[in-house]
Every structure is written in C-alpha cells, then in structure tokens.
C-alpha cells in the first residue's frame, strides 16, 4: 500500500490555511457581531418593556377614569359625614386599587376630612400621580388622587434586564424613578454616550415614560468572553492539527480496512471478527461494526415491541393534557361562586375532582362507554354553571352499547368543540347518538349552534392532519391523532356543518 506522507503534508498545509486564518476572522467577526446583536437585542427589549409599561399604566388610568365616570351620579347621593357611607366608599376604592397590577394608594380629600389607604404615611410626592378627579358628594366636594408606588413589571425589568424607568412631565421634571442616579423633582438630561433609551407618551398632560439601559454594565463581560473563546478555539485548532497529523500517519490502513468491513456489513457478508493491524481508537469502531451486525437481527425483532411501547407513551402523553383552559375557567367560576353560593361551589369542586380523578387515572387508557358518558355529563354540568344553563345535553345510547370499551376521553373533545365553536346567543342543544354495527362503534355528536362557513369547515378538516400542537383546533387534532395511534387507519372522523345550521361530527372506531 502506498505511503500517506504526502497526504499528511497536504493536510498540514490545509489545516493552517483553512483553520488558523478562519479562527482569526471568526474572532474579529464575533466581536463585531456580539456588539451589533447586543445593541439590537437591548433596543428590542427596551422597546418591548416601554410599550408594556405604557400599556399597563394607561390601562390603570383608563380603569379609574371609567370607574369614576360610572359612579359619579351615585356618589352625589352619598354623604361622607355618615360612617356607613364612609365604610362603603373605602371598600369601593380599595377594591379598585387591589384589582390593579401595581402598588397603588388613593387619597380622597375634602374641606374637612380626608381618607386614604396610605396607612404607613409614605411620602406621596415620591410617587407617580396617575390620575386626579374632582367629585361632588352630598356633603362636600372632594379631590380623589391615585398614586403609584411601583409595579411588579417595573421591578422585574430592573431585576432581570438591568433597565431603569423614569416618568417625566412636559418640562422634563422627574415624577417617578426606580434608579438611584435620579431623584424626584430634578431635571432629566439624557446621557450622551453609552446609554440606550426609548420614550413614550403616557397621558394628555404630556407625561412621558422613559426606559433606558447603561450598556457599559455588560459590554466588558462580553468582550472578555470573546477573548476566552478565541484562546480556546486556537488551542483546539493546534490540538486538532497534531491529532490529524498523527491519524493520517498511523491510521490510514485501518481506515481503509474499516471502510471495507462497512461495505461487507451493508451486504450482510461480514464474517467472523478480525482485529485491526494496529491497536488504536479505531478498534472501537471495528468492534462496533461487528456488534452492530450481530445485533441487527435482534433489533428487527424488537422493533414491533418498541412501537407498541411508543404508542402507549404517546397515548399517556395526550391523556395528560387535561384542558388547562377549562381547568382555569372552572377555578375562576369556583372563586366567583364561593361568596355567592357556597353549596353550588362545593358541588362544582366535587364534580371537578371526579373529572380530574377520571382523566388522570393511569391504570388503563380504556374505559367503559358509560363512564365516558358520565364524565361528559359532569363536564357539561360545570359548563352550564359558567354559561347560565344555556347548554342542553341529550344522550341516546342503548344499554348494551354503554358496556362497550373505548379509549378514555375519546368523546369529550367532540362535546368541547361543540360548546367552544357552536355556542351563540341562543341555548345550545347537543345530541350524542351512539350505535353498534358490525363490531364498530358509530358516534354522532350534533349541535344546533352557529355552524361554519364552507371555507371554515375546510380549514377545520385540514387541521385534523396537521402535526399535534400545530393547530388552533387542538381538541379535534389530539382526538384524531390519538385514534390513529390506538386504532390505526380503522378510525374515522368526519365533520359536516352549515353556517347558522349547526355542526355534525361522525366518529367511527373499532371496538377494543
């Protein structure tokens, strides 16, 4: 066999030309790219944080403006000289303050008395005055002021991004800050270099919100990181150069032998084990080729068992996705019912616990049809509490059919889809009809809801064949994919609908 010395010389020259020089260029480009990307990312996050903060503060201002406007007529009959009216007024203001995502204080001041939730007597001159209203009560005219001490959003921006916030008036006087470099009442002068900032208008009084960042705080660390990366890359190139030279010198014959054995293994003509001429790390590859060839038959035999396990894992994964939006809405309903109707809230909690126990049961992914129908009835019962009994459920399933076994939670997505996409201003009637024919279960779910246009219906049908989690119709998509995993191509799901005439879903599955 020919010597590989010329190849080693060529490899040495190639490594020097194609590795050393590119590494140097990568360091230069990396330094420039790091700075450019850093500036771009910071500008983007500052813009995003400025917009989020502006939206939050304006929403709070709008909320109190709407609240005061709606209550002014009623407040004209309120006499704040009476303790009962005082207590009622305090509760109203505290409720509005506590509903906002910020630490707020109100100050209601008249000619002879005042009310506030600033029990710690904090200095309100260091807070941002969100809004101010003149309100006429029965006994006197009062001035209502709403102050903001801080918000979780601004704290998180300061903590996580190192960005500071200012609120200034039309004369650039600082009204609010969370940075020690500025103080309330001083004039704001934008730094000339090393700072990035963005400003947005807050209200009609020309107050502006400013979010800014000192780029000197992190640019030095970034440069140091690039220097370290450059040194590491240079060391790796040197090590790779030496290793490649030795491999070209010592392992050429063994590489060719390995290539020949790979070709023999592809054609299933590989004989008994033969070690390489030189003992090296390539011997691991040589051993692996023989081990792979010997285990090929065992691998083929285990494929079928592995596929079954994979299907079980996929089924369990889909079952664990218990409608987080439904659970969230139900918990909100319970929270609303607890002070109004504790007994109803207790009933909802019991129904929800039974549904969770049913959906999270891992002993088997198949259940009796009667259990599935009971689960659906509980689901609709909870939905009726949310929607004021606007859903009517009718089940037409013979007794012998209810003893059949189906996949757990195979019907619930159909009912959920009917409620979510079919409910309108009129009562929604959902009919479930189940029949058994020739070892197949035929399930029809019909609703008299708003239906779908032809184009919308076509999009829904196409969404059944999209990847899981890649569609807005997750319930039907999960159901379709799960049915294929569990029953193969024998499962069928057809959807028919007309605008303002309801929707019909026909579901056919083989019996387990």
Curated annotation (Swiss-Prot):
Substrates-to-products reaction catalysed: ATP + protein L-histidine = ADP + protein N-phospho-L-histidine
Histidine kinase domain boundaries: 297-512
Keyword presence, Transmembrane: yes
Tagged with keyword Transmembrane: yes
Transmembrane segments: 20-40, 222-242
Main location: membrane
Modified residues (Phosphohistidine): 325
Pfam families from the UniProt entry: HATPase_c, His_kinase
Cell compartments where the protein resides: Cell membrane
Keywords for the protein's UniProt record, in alphabetical order: ATP-binding, Cell membrane, Kinase, Membrane, Nucleotide-binding, Phosphoprotein, Transferase, Transmembrane, Transmembrane helix, Two-component regulatory system
GO molecular function, one term: ATP binding
Family matches, as Gene3D superfamilies: Histidine kinase-like ATPase, C-terminal domain
EC code(s) of this entry: 2.7.13.3
GO cellular component: plasma membrane
UniProt PTM comment: Autophosphorylated.
Membrane topology: Multi-pass membrane protein
Function description: Probable member of the two-component regulatory system SERP2405/SERP2406. May activate SERP2406 by phosphorylation.
Full protein name: Uncharacterized sensor-like histidine kinase SERP2405
Protein's organism: Staphylococcus epidermidis (strain ATCC 35984 / DSM 28319 / BCRC 17069 / CCUG 31568 / BM 3577 / RP62A)
């Amino acid at each position: 066999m020919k010597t590989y010395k010329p190849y080693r010389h060529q490899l040495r020259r190639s490594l020097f030309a194609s590795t050393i020089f590119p590494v140097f260029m990568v360091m230069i480009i990396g330094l420039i790219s790091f700075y450019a990307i850093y500036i771009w990312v910071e500008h983007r996050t500052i813009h995003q944080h400025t917009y989020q903060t502006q939206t939050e503060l304006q929403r709070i201002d709008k909320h109190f403006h709407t609240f005061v406007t709606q209550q002014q007529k009623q407040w004209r009959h309120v006499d704040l000289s009476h303790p009962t009216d005082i207590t009622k007024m305090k509760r109203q203001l505290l409720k509005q303050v506590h509903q906002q995502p910020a630490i707020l204080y109100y100050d209601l001041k008249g000619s002879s008395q005042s009310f506030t939730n600033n029990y710690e007597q904090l200095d309100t001159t260091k807070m941002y005055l969100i809004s101010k209203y003149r309100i006429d009560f029965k006994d006197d005219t009062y001035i209502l002021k709403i102050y903001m001490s801080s918000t979780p959003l601004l704290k998180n921006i300061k903590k996580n991004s190192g960005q500071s916030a200012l609120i200034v008036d039309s004369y650039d006087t600082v009204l609010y800050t969370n940075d020690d470099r500025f103080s309330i009442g001083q004039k704001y002068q934008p730094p000339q270099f090393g700072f990035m900032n963005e400003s947005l208008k807050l209200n009609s009084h020309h107050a502006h919100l400013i979010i800014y960042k000192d780029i000197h705080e992190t640019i030095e660390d970034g440069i140091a990181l690039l220097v370290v990366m450059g040194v590491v890359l240079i060391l790796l190139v040197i090590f790779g150069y030496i290793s490649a030279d030795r491999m070209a010198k010592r392992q050429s014959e063994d590489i060719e032998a390995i290539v020949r054995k790979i070709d023999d293994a592809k054609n299933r003509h590989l004989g008994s084990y033969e070690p390489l001429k030189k003992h090296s790390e390539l011997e691991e590859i040589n051993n692996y080729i023989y081990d792979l060839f010997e285990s090929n038959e065992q691998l083929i035999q285990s494929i079928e068992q592995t596929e079954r396990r994979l299907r079980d894992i996929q089924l369990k994964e889909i079952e664990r996705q218990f409608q987080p939006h439904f659970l969230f809405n139900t918990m909100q309903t319970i929270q609303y019912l607890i002070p109004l109707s504790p007994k109803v809230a207790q009933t909802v909690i019991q129904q929800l616990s039974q549904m969770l126990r049913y959906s999270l049961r891992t002993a088997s992914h198949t259940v009796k049809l009667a259990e599935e129908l009971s689960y659906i009835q509980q689901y609709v019962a909870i939905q009726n509490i949310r929607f004021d009994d606007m859903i009517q459920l009718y089940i037409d399933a013979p007794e012998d059919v209810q003893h059949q076994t189906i996949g757990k939670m195979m019907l619930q997505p159909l009912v959920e889809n009917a409620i979510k996409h079919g409910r309108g201003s009129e009562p929604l009637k959902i009919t479930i009809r189940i029949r058994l024919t020739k070892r197949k279960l035929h399930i029809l779910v019909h609703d008299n809801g708003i239906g779908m246009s032809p184009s919308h219906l076509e999009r829904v049908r196409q969404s059944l064949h999209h990847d899981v989690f890649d569609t807005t119709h997750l319930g039907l998509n999960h159901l379709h994919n799960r049915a294929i995993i569990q029953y193969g191509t024998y499962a069928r799901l057809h959807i028919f609908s007309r605008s303002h005439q309801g929707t019909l879903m026909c579901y056919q599955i083989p019996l387990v």
